[in-house]
Regions:
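P-loop NTPase nucleotide-binding core
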Residues: 1-146
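The catalytic "switch" region of P-loop NTPases
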Residues: 101-244
């Protein structure tokens, strides 16, 4: 379904909702990634310390807690709330508290949870515009920590932004796109690949990218250039004909 690009928080929710792994293409990936992340931590602990999680349970749990804290240090610098939620998820899974674990998953998906659950998780806020970008960066860091190469985000049919009734909404959407481009260019989304698709009208009409000059300056290319540079920000695709 269409994602309102003018709302960062909705973009994040759609990313989480549609995120998949190569091995589980039909199942939402968030819970899978968290479990794989914990499993990787366990494997590291057992290998480095040469211990058995059952026979040496007390030592194993102590080492796991140290490892979790070490892994969450960098994540906490991006979003302390996100790191606290992951920490709570681990503790809940350790003691079999499925209610809290599911609450963490709901919060990470961008769903609103009760104040009491937020206190349990030690998170101050729910997902909102001001923290959505940090959440996108945090989930990308978690993916890397879990052993994935990174995150691919595909935003299709960007031309729908042209149909937004309010000019302010279109401007917000294009400004958000400009922000994504600048952050990616400045390595703000390390190991994250963005692919956008849209029509020629999106590039060339006044309700399209031209309406926000800073964005248009970043992505405009010579459509008639016969040499196709795959490193340029926009690549025009040839239209299909009957033979194709």
């Amino acid at each position: 379904s269409e994602t309102p690009l003018n709302k960062f928080e909705e973009v994040y929710k759609k990313i989480i909702e549609n995120m998949r792994t190569p091995e589980n293409k039909k199942v939402p990936a968030l819970a899978i990634i968290l479990e794989e992340w914990l499993l990787k931590m366990e494997e590291i602990i057992c290998e480095v310390n040469d211990i058995d999680p059952i026979d040496d349970e007390e030592i194993f749990l102590a080492e796991m807690e140290k490892r979790i804290e070490m892994e969450l240090t960098d994540l906490g610098k991006v979003s302390s709330n996100f790191a606290n939620a992951i920490r709570t998820y681990y503790k809940a899974k350790t003691v079999g508290d499925n209610v809290t674990a599911q609450a963490v998953l709901a919060w990470l998906k961008g769903e609103k949870i009760s104040l009491s659950l937020k206190k349990t998780m030690n998170v101050a806020v729910n997902l909102e515009r001001s923290n959505a970008i940090l959440f996108i960066k945090a989930i990308n860091m978690l993916l890397k920590s879990a052993g994935y190469s990174g995150l691919v985000i595909i935003m299709d049919e960007l031309e729908t932004v042209r149909n937004y009734v309010k000019k302010s909404s279109r401007d917000e959407a294009y400004e958000n796109l400009r922000y994504f481009i600048d952050e990616a260019d400045g390595n703000g989304f390390e190991n994250c690949f963005f692919l956008y698709s849209g029509t020629t009208e999106l590039m060339e009409t006044e309700r399209g990218f031209k309406s926000l000059e800073p964005l248009y300056q970043r992505i405009k290319v010579d459509k008639e250039d016969k040499f196709r540079n795959l490193r340029q920000p926009v690549i025009y695709l040839k239209e299909f004909n009957n033979s194709k």
